[in-house]
């Protein structure tokens, strides 16, 4: 059965508070599966399985699938629809409260697939990356504007701290755009399927990741300010900051959105050296 048929079969009522929009376009499902590159060696962690339409396709291809679902009304539907699969584990929990490192422990070749409510997208991605969860890739349906921020390059308005965070740890690839007509109920925004391939090592080697991300966040907190003014929040004396900018070869009159990840790394290392 397709998504609409399962929804009608169980007379499922959508929960607006959970931001539920279920994918009904089978061509998008196929592109997610193809883009995620799932094989029998892979353990898949799926966040937001809905009524299990995509989950079935994952179960056919993966070694095992762990699906995380918050809505208690969907649990019996998923249990019934997927009862024939012995490689399926359903976790009834808020993904924001999951210990992903614990879930991924002693599992090989972990790939994540997610169709999340848009309000939890950034927190989930941030946690998976900053907590150094051991996964190979994340294929995710997200709001178009968020995908554009993740995939941005310097010198554009979309480029920001989220861009740097994701691209520090991952290569990014947009798989396809998805219109509101591909969902029930229809969301008010366009969506994009994007894949994040985890790098074996961070894109740049820095002396302190904590300082690196502090510099990045401070640089984007007030986008229209120069780096010199933005980085005053670090509470470093004027002479030391002048020295750090000079050693990094970066003009303090530039704005954060003009710096590449490599330049952020160079600047944070020079600041680290003077602390």
Curated annotation (Swiss-Prot):
UniProt enzyme class: transferase
Keywords assigned: Cytoplasm, Methyltransferase, RNA-binding, rRNA processing, S-adenosyl-L-methionine, Transferase
GO molecular function, one term: RNA binding
UniProt entry tagged with the keyword Cytoplasm: yes
Chain sites annotated for binding S-adenosyl-L-methionine: 21, 23, 48, 69, 94, 115
GO cellular component labels: cytosol
Annotated transmembrane regions: none
Compartments (UniProt record): Cytoplasm
Keyword Protein biosynthesis: no
UniProt main location, coarse: cytoplasm
HAMAP family cross-referenced by the UniProt entry: 16SrRNA_methyltr_A (MF_00607)
The family this protein is said to belong to: Belongs to the class I-like SAM-binding methyltransferase superfamily. rRNA adenine N(6)-methyltransferase family. RsmA subfamily.
Descriptive protein name: Ribosomal RNA small subunit methyltransferase A
Organism name: Clostridium botulinum (strain Okra / Type B1)
